Amino acid sequence: NCGNYGADGIVGPHHEKEGSYFTIKQVWCPIQIRVDSLDSQFDGKLRIENRYDFLNANTCRFTYKYVQLPSVTDKGGMKVMKQGEVNCPDIPAHGVGTLTIPAAMKGANALLLTVTDKNGNDLFTWSYKLEDIAGLQQVSAGNKPSYKETADALTVDAGGRTFTFSQKDGQLKGVKIGSRTISLTNGPRFIAAKRSDRSMDQFYNHDDKEAEKKKTQYTTFEDAGCFTGFSVREEGNNVVVTANYKLGCFDQAVWTISPDGTAAIDFTYNFSGVVDLMGVMFDYPEDKVLSKRWVGDGPYRVWQNRLHGPQLGVWENEYNDPIPAESFTYPEFKGYFACLLYTSPSPRD
């Protein structure tokens, strides 16, 4: 534990459910599904374990739901394609058996399974992704995007949107939609960070007398690479902008901009060190974030030793940044969310 920076608890003072509440529900659930993942070829058979000390598993029942999770552009929630109930098979205490439900159905991309005990209490709900969710669909019909290069910037106009890229570092410096300015800037750029109390091999740094004070801090690695220039090409009705780099961690960023103003980005980077965090980042003013909606594990974030509990679904919460034990606003907005398929933040601009 690290004072107020430690992992969250189970419930708050007024029984507010914290992240670990769901972890405990999963870890100590007396009926366990012993399957890590499923796919669209799922035949309906599941290995389950009865961890009751005295009760037979047939005192419980399962509710199954084949659902369709929304795509990136779909603002709706989960659609139930098929659902039903089945009784647990005859499995003695501490035994293992097979639960059979209808096989995966066409059109469903996820499966939810809820086990209920003999008193009607829901013990836990597992969720499994069966198929990939449809990604962002770029509309290629319409007027081809136009672009212009100057000594300072590369600009692309498409669908009433203007994207501005810097000739100095290759990064996106702003997006305008008519008179509106979207404040997403300075990216993508490489980021890697390690805990400041650790040495380069990630062990505790006993040579640093101040290490104890740094255990909640992170040290970032500077990318020594340099931007070498843009290459622009037309691909059908799309314009593809590639920012190239050398001698560093970031290799390239490829922007595909469609006639409707939709932009998709692919990037590559390399890094051979040992770190806690690694990826790419942009800048966006925190005070302009209102909420976020995501498809992935939720509604709570995960922690180093608390990976169980959150389940695949459609989740949404408003921005919050509470100090632990000072307020009890849950779920927390910030943090590391497992199995994230996509997120859609709601900005002020």
Spell out what each predicted region is.
Residues K45-Y52, L111-V115, G160:
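Buried hydrophobic-core signal for structured, non-transmembrane domains
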Residues T73-K106:
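Intrinsically disordered, low-complexity Pro/Gly/Ser/Thr-rich segments with frequent PxxP/GP/PP motifs
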Residues N1-R47, D53-N58, T63-M78:
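Extended substrate-binding grooves/exosites of carbohydrate-active enzymes
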